[in-house]
Amino acid sequence: MNSAPKRKLIETSLPLEAINDASVREKSIRHGHPSTLHLYWARRPLATARAVLFAQLVDDPASRPEEFPTAEAQDTERARLHELMERLVKWENSNDAELFNQAREEIRKSNEGELPAVLDPFAGGGSIPLEAQRLGLEAHASDLNPLAVLIDKALIEIPPKFFSSPPVYPGTAEERTEWVRAEGLAADVREYGRWIRDEAERRIGHLYPKVTAPGGTEHTVIAWIWARTVRSPNPANPIETPLVRSWWLSKKKGKEAWVRAAVENGKVRYEVVHSADGPTGDDEGTVGRKGGLAIGDGTAISLNYIREQGRAQKLGEHLIAIVAEGPKGRIYISPNEVHEEAFNVELPSNVPMGDLPKNPRDFKTPNYGMSKWSDLFTNRQLVALTTLSDLVGEAREKILADALAAGTPEGERLEKGDTGAAAYADAVATYLALAVSRTTDYSSSLCSWHNTGEKMRNVFARQAIPMVWDFAEANPLSSSTGSYLGQLEWVAKAVERVPA
């Protein structure tokens, strides 16, 4: 006859304050956190997942009276386990081998000397199976969402296959004597990612010219600030009007900058002004929730009219400012013809042309004629993203060749569960593709410029596709906010820290 199951620690008490504090603090930890590998909704805090798994698998002292016969002895042991949990949930201790060995021993004591397997059938962003793996448990995960499956494979399945493997990029393995966890994998992600960026610049760099400041110095562009435009409904003055939420480029104290728009010869001219004395209130922009106002004469433009013009494919865009890398931070420069002309490129042939869902609550752009996936990007962005995507496949071939040259047998592909050169090339290419996908979140015409933080704001700030009037087009070939190299570094740092 089987004995009754023992009461677990989670059924009695938990150090909730420590768990809550660690979970809240996780939100401010960015570089190296697994959540930065790729965006996914409603990720569970790692500290909570780790604590709950441990407390579910470890017996409460009261269920082991042969070891802890008195209430006092049980309280003392419970306090010891709580102290261990308080150390376990701290982010700084995530890769403390000695601490996690102690945790594994406690789990073994409560499970007949074994480390049990853990299954999360709806793993989502992978917090539970990832922390199960960190605790030394056999982790199994599944999900209905293919993105979740890919993220979970990249966090949980791939790194252990190449545990402590040195990188294969020529000359990199010799940089240190020992490669721990997935550090070698992360090093190759960086090196082949930089190759992708450099090759992309060679192919499409002419589409991203440097900008000349008023003093004559050249600077790398971080972002181009655009405003969508609509023809004024006033027949006496049918000017092409910019639709702008805010003319402000920077509200940072001492670095204030904004755009002044003026009508000259029936056209709008834009000038960057460096002054704290900028537009306020109703003058801060030209469009709001109820519609817009025409530049010059102030003609009211209803939201319905803007939507009609959008569905008739009559919305345009004006370049209103350029953000560039300066010697002491961001600099803001007035637009010019060189950068307007660089924007005018042909739509590439191999872009996703599917229709957006008909869901006006969460997908706002079809109301304005942007009903296909490709409509959410400028042509230049589509050229950049298709180029980067194509280069991931080319990078895989380079990785395979370099791995073979390093003496690794070719073996089967990663999907077959192998760990040879072919599987390794697949693994690195997976992370490179995730970096391109992250770049997409910062490379659409639905991104905006954060004028207090002086940085790009991504599309998925919330779980919806909004309509954005004045949008920021990041330079994917720069090394600044919204660039491919920036997204690559987020991925590489996440890979470095995952348990392998």
Feature-to-residue mapping (PLM):
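Conserved glycine-centered beta->alpha loop in an early N-terminal alpha/beta scaffold
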Residues: 122
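Nucleic-acid modification enzymes, centered on SAM-dependent nucleic-acid methyltransferases
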Residues: 2-119, 129, 133-500
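Conserved SAM/SAH-binding loop
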Residues: 125
